[in-house]
């Protein structure tokens, strides 16, 4: 009978990060998956990252996770979303060669120290009570009846838990096209009274590249040079390709409307789908006034003829999907290689978890990924690494756990949202969910988290050394900029007008002004030109060379955000102090500027009595709470003024 310190069930994005993290910490770890050949499979879109999501990938990488390095080896179209806006909303995103990404993940996982991979399915657990009457994991039981002893299990079932695929009226028990669902495991969770719910998601049809008329479509070129995700990647080496844009039209919508009754969404109305990644059926129904919807045609690989039409996820019958596709510009002759479909699956109420992602009902059992009601590769990876870390620390019987907080990471925001608010629809990360988003950006994940990982022996010496070199270089540059001064009068000769107070400003002070950048500083102090080129090597590795290019950017971003961070902290202090503020029962939320229709709808329906209660409602962001508080305070001030 085999025994392992940690057993991870599931080889998707959550499972791979959990297994790698547990193994990095030195535990004897087993990863059990249905098929070794599907480890690292990108089940839906062939891309990693995005707004908020890209920050999570950087955070996972800062903790020595594997997703960032894998996508850097597979990236064929890279962009920084929102690059024209502030760094707090930058969203690194990379289109992947699907085969290369899976190959990269498998090469990493199958050669990882302390990690064994087994092709099998888990149907049950052996759970016993300890001396304190607590239920504890003792073993996993496979479909072949084998008992594998362990005290720590991380369950990452994705969409496989009682999974059912829908294509029109046709239904097939499956967690992913071509893969069996996990039925017995769902029964096991029911047996131990876990609160299970049902969610669904979907995917679009895949198209044949050679049957698309690319010449009449709008080309979308990626960034040049492409920016890597991992702090250990010097540069992207894969050839870069373009994506293309087309649109649905009135005829497309007519075809969809006439067949809505045949879509899975018509008979799965009680199973909630992702609000922020809706199917084309939902778009046509919900936004009836729109004459078109955008579609991104994304290549799935350099030597792959498959194209992913991002924006038309659906569960219509195959013949309707064909008719719909041929109504779209550029796709008149397009052939479908695989139809789109919806998949429904079980999830557990994440409020049954601690912030470590250990279950409250069974000691030693952890959940990560879509089983917790989330959607997205990145959200899964972020949960997986935290669950794997805590399972390993607990296996060593260490008293401390590893918990990230809302103040230090998007992973912390996500997990706190899940375990305190729960979910009523597939959860997706957004910058609006993070009250400290000005501080937890994509550019500083290593400076926020790598030290935390190193302190528990999770992070390699190589990564830690790169960080230390980077921090020292940032410090040196800030000191240099702090030593260069100029008066407001002198600045006017360079066309810069600031407060005429006679006080000398340092170069670092000037960087905080929105209209002053590195180019302007070099004009004032030409000696800074040599600094920005960084001709001297910063360290001893290629990763050091990557990091040195980020030094000037890091210093400028920190300078620009400093006054806003002070204001952000003041807002959060205001929020903490006003948590018991009462909200009138007849309060009209639509009068509050900046609230989304989703937030207004939920608050008008629930009618929370206090700010504290409103804050706990799923989907209500900290920014929304601050806006309501400011409105209430201003209204109170106006009322008081009328009595003066």
Swiss-Prot record:
Matching Gene3D superfamilies: FAD/NAD(P)-binding domain, GidA associated domain, C-terminal subdomain, tRNA uridine 5-carboxymethylaminomethyl modification enzyme MnmG/GidA
Keyword Cytoplasm: yes
Any one cellular-component term (Gene Ontology): cytosol
Domain of life: Bacteria
Signal peptide: none
Cofactor: FAD
Subcellular location: Cytoplasm
Alphabetical list of SUPFAM superfamilies matching this protein: FAD/NAD(P)-binding domain
Pfam family, one: GIDA
Major location category of this protein: cytoplasm
Keywords: Cytoplasm, FAD, Flavoprotein, NAD, tRNA processing
Residues that, per the record, bind FAD: 10-15
Binding site for NAD(+): 273-287
GO molecular function annotations of the record: flavin adenine dinucleotide binding
One GO biological process term: tRNA methylation
Family: Belongs to the MnmG family.
HAMAP family: MnmG_GidA
Subunit and interaction comment: Homodimer. Heterotetramer of two MnmE and two MnmG subunits.
Task of the protein: NAD-binding protein involved in the addition of a carboxymethylaminomethyl (cmnm) group at the wobble position (U34) of certain tRNAs, forming tRNA-cmnm(5)s(2)U34.
Protein name as annotated: tRNA uridine 5-carboxymethylaminomethyl modification enzyme MnmG
Organism, as annotated: Wolbachia sp. subsp. Drosophila simulans (strain wRi)
């Amino acid at each position: 009978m085999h025994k392992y310190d940690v057993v991870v069930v599931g080889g998707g994005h959550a499972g791979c990060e959990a297994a790698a993290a547990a193994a990095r910490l030195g535990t004897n770890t087993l990863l059990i998956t249905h098929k070794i050949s599907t480890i690292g499979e990108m089940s839906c879109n062939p891309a990693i990252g995005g707004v908020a999501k890209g920050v999570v990938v950087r955070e996972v990488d800062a903790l020595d996770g594997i997703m960032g390095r894998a996508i850097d080896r597979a990236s064929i179209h890279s962009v920084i979303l929102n690059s024209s806006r502030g760094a707090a909303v930058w969203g690194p995103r990379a289109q992947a060669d699907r085969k290369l990404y899976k190959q990269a993940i498998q090469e990493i996982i199958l050669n990882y120290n302390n990690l064994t991979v087994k092709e099998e399915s888990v149907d049950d657990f052996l759970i016993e009570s300890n001396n304190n009457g607590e239920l504890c994991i003792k073993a996993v039981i496979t479909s072949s009846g084998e008992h594998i002893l362990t005290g720590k299990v991380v369950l990452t079932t994705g969409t496989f838990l009682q999974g059912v695929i829908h294509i029109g009226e046709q239904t097939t028990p499956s967690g992913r096209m071509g893969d069996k669902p996990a039925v017995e495991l769902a029964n096991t969770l029911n047996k131990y009274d876990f609160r299970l719910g049902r969610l669904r998601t979907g995917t679009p049809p895949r198209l044949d590249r050679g049957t698309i008329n690319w010449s009449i479509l709008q080309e979308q070129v990626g960034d040049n040079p492409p920016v890597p995700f991992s702090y250990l990647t010097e540069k992207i080496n894969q050839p870069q390709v373009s994506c293309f844009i087309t649109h649905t039209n009135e005829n497309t919508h007519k075809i969809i409307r006439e067949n809505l009754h045949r879509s899975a969404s018509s008979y799965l109305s009680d199973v909630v789908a992702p609000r922020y990644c809706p199917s084309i059926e939902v778009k046509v129904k919900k936004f009836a006034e729109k004459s078109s919807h955008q579609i991104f045609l994304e290549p799935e690989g350099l030597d792959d003829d498959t194209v992913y039409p991002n924006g038309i996820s659906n569960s219509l019958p195959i013949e309707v999907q064909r008719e719909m596709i041929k109504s779209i510009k550029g796709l008149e002759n397009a052939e479908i290689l695989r139809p789109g479909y919806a998949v429904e699956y079980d999830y557990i109420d994440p409020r049954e978890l601690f912030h470590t992602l250990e279950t409250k009902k069974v000691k030693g059992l952890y959940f990560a990924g879509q089983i917790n009601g989330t959607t997205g590769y990145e959200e899964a990876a972020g949960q997986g690494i935290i669950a794997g870390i805590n399972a390993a620390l607990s296996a060593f019987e260490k008293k401390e756990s590893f918990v990230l907080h809302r103040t230090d990471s998007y992973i912390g925001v996500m997990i706190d949202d899940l375990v305190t608010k729960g979910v009523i629809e597939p959860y997706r990360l957004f910058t609006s969910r993070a009250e400290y988003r000005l501080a937890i950006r994509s550019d500083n994940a290593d400076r926020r988290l790598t030290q935390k990982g190193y302190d528990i022996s999770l992070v390699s010496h190589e990564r830690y050394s790169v960080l230390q070199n980077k921090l020292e270089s940032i410090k040196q540059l800030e000191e240099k900029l702090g030593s260069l001064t100029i008066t407001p009068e002198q600045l006017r000769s360079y066309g810069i007008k600031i407060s005429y107070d006679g006080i000398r400003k340092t170069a670092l002070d000037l960087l905080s002004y929105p209209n002053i950048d590195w180019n302007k500083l070099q004009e004032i102090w030409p000696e800074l030109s040599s600094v920005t080129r960084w001709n001297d090597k910063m360290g001893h590795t290629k990763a050091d060379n990557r990091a040195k290019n980020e030094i000037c950017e890091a210093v400028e971003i920190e300078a620009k955000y400093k006054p806003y961070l002070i204001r952000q902290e003041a807002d959060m202090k205001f929020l903490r102090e006003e948590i018991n503020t009462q909200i009138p029962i007849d309060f009209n939320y639509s009068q509050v500027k900046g609230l989304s229709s989703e937030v207004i709808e939920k608050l008008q329906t629930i009618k929370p009595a206090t700010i504290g209660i409103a804050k706990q409602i799923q989907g209500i962001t900290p920014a929304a709470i601050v806006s309501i508080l400011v409105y209430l305070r201003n209204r109170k001030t106006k009322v008081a003024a009328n009595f003066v």
